[in-house]
From Swiss-Prot:
It comes from the Eukaryota. HAMAP family: MatK. It comes from Solanum bulbocastanum. The keyword Repeat does not apply. This is Maturase K. The keyword Plastid applies. Belongs to the intron maturase 2 family. MatK subfamily. GO terms for cellular component: chloroplast.
Length: 509
């Protein structure tokens, strides 16, 4: 790490060329593949007994041949004729992308560490915007029900690869590395294979996930940072304390240009953008911007974000990707839940002297529901049930042992219960458990060539225990005769902090 710091020192002679030399350092590829650096066998050497797929010697030779223009500049139609690319094109692409992703992440990690510490006796700006997915849960529980309107935003996707390069250019002051990145993106990769916009999120090549996730996250960070800048300093559109934006190239030039446009048309209403109750939450490619303000205020934010993104990223942003919804009238799909705010009317009888009257108190209640139709669709796609939710057997698992079949069905059921434990109504989850349990029984009955009724009579209790969730197991063991109040605690909303994403239902082939 000392050598990494030496390359990243601002006053170093290699100030503008500090990342490119790291490409040829052997420990970079050990870090990229989580290999230990204290191995007796150095990855410097290429031999048949070691996986030399990420040897830096191969990468060095590859980069050298990349810059031999007479041998490398080819068209797509000639790729089959060129022995350098051929069938190894994806292999070379993965080698460079893994190493480059590991290298380019170094300045970001060091920047984060330095921002959280003191430098020369002065406190460096500490970002209060670093939040994990865990902060989403208290936001939904505590703040969501007190807001009025929400902007459902699909983050604009980069329409050109050069936008990704320009995004990194704000942070990486290294021309050689950026040229290598640009060359790699245009020669090795196809835009359609890198990023697809068929869904709200993005899908990446499985072989280069780390590299492409880094590019996407840096792009999303750029979108979010500009929004935070506008959110914190929207009244005068100028910041002197937001340290993360001070190093950007031409950033304030674009800001001043945008201010001139808005100053002419919105001299009176510009102060309305200052909203202390504005909240921003993102999950994958979908984000929400919730406020306690009015509909005109949210409409101004929509118009403002569209114009700013188009100006800052030099791309067309369709206004249909931002929808303004009232929380009390719409449900939204976020983090796999259907979230909504409902009004519960509570009637209270009040009496004053001899007169009595009823008072209607509307109370906002936040609800998170399990999307039953998409979930049954996923189960049907994995051949656990029909599209109508009727359980069916899974013939591809019939060759496994009984314990393996029960374990696989039980694991899927427990994973679903674990992920959707934050649901305010668990009735849907018990329906999913019924589908999986009966599908498991049909699969076992098919294997033993018997009926489901006969099989359930023979091993019904054992099959039931495998589908108990961890909470149900604890309650059944600790309180064998648990009262309904204890089981009611379990049926309430529970957020698990180890939830990041839901795994594929059929992760066994």
């Amino acid at each position: 790490m000392e050598e990494i710091h030496r390359y990243l020192q601002p006053d170093s002679s290699q100030q503008h060329n500090f990342l490119y030399p790291l490409i040829f350092q052997e420990y970079i590829y050990a870090l990229a593949q989580d290999h230990g650096l204290n191995r007796n066998r150095s990855i410097l050497l290429e031999n048949s007994g070691y996986n030399n797929k990420f040897s830096f010697l191969i990468v060095k030779r590859l980069i050298t041949r990349m810059y031999q223009q007479n041998h490398f500049i080819i068209s797509t139609n000639d790729s089959n004729k060129n022995p350098f690319l051929g069938c190894n094109k994806s292999l070379y692409s993965q080698m460079i992308s893994e190493g480059f992703a590991c290298i380019v992440e170094i300045p970001f990690s060091i920047r984060l560490i330095s921002s959280l510490s003191s430098f020369e006796g002065k406190k460096i700006f500490k970002s209060h915007n670093l939040r994990s997915i865990h902060s989403t849960f208290p936001f939904l529980e505590d703040n969501f029900s007190h807001l009025n309107y929400v902007l459902d935003i699909l983050i604009p996707y980069p329409v050109h690869l050069e936008i990704l390069v320009q995004t990194l250019r704000y942070w990486v002051k290294d021309a050689s590395s950026l040229h290598l990145l640009r060359f790699f993106l245009h020669e090795y990769c196809n835009l359609n294979s890198l990023i697809t916009s068929k869904k709200p999120g993005y899908s990446f090549s499985k072989k280069n996930q780390r590299f492409f996730f880094f590019l996407y996250n840096s792009y999303v960070y750029e979108c979010e940072s500009t929004f935070v800048f506008l959110r914190n300093q929207s009244s005068h559109l100028r910041s002197t304390s937001f340290g993360a934006l001070l190093e950007r190239i031409y950033f304030y030039g674009k800001i001043e240009r945008l201010v001139e446009v808005f100053a002419k048309d919105f001299q009176v209403t510009l102060w309305l953008f200052k909203d202390p109750f504005m909240h921003y939450v993102r999950y994958e490619g979908k984000s929400i911007l919730a406020s306690k303000g009015t509909f005109p205020l949210m409409n101004k934010w929509k118009f403002y974000l569209v114009n700013f993104w188009q100006c800052h990223f030099s791309m067309y942003f369709h206004t249909g990707r931002i929808h303004i919804n009232q929380l009390s009238n719409h449900s939204r799909d976020f983090m796999g839940y259907l979230s909504s705010v409902r009004l519960n009317h509570s009637m209270v009888r009040s009496q004053m002297l001899e007169n009595s009257f009823l008072i209607n108190n509307p109370i906002k209640k936040f609800e998170t529901l399990v999307p039953i139709i998409p979930l049954i669709g996923s189960l049907a796609k994995a051949h656990f049930c029909t599209v109508l939710g009727h359980p069916i057997s899974k013939p591809v698992w019939s060759d496994l042992s009984d314990s393996d079949i029960i374990d696989r069905f039980g694991r899927i059921c427990r994973n679903l219960f674990h992920y959707y434990s934050g649901s305010s109504k668990k009735k849907t989850l018990y329906r999913i458990k019924y589908i999986l349990r009966l599908s498991c029984a049909r699969t076992l009955a098919r294997k033993h060539k018997s009926t489901v009724r006969t099989f359930l009579k023979r091993s019904g209790s054992e099959l039931l225990e495998e589908f108990l969730t961890s909470e149900e197991q604890v309650l059944s063991l600790t309180f064998p005769r648990a009262s309904s109040s204890l089981w009611g605690v379990y049926r309430s909303r529970i957020w698990y902090l180890d939830i990041f994403c839901i795994n594929d239902l059929a992760n066994y082939q």
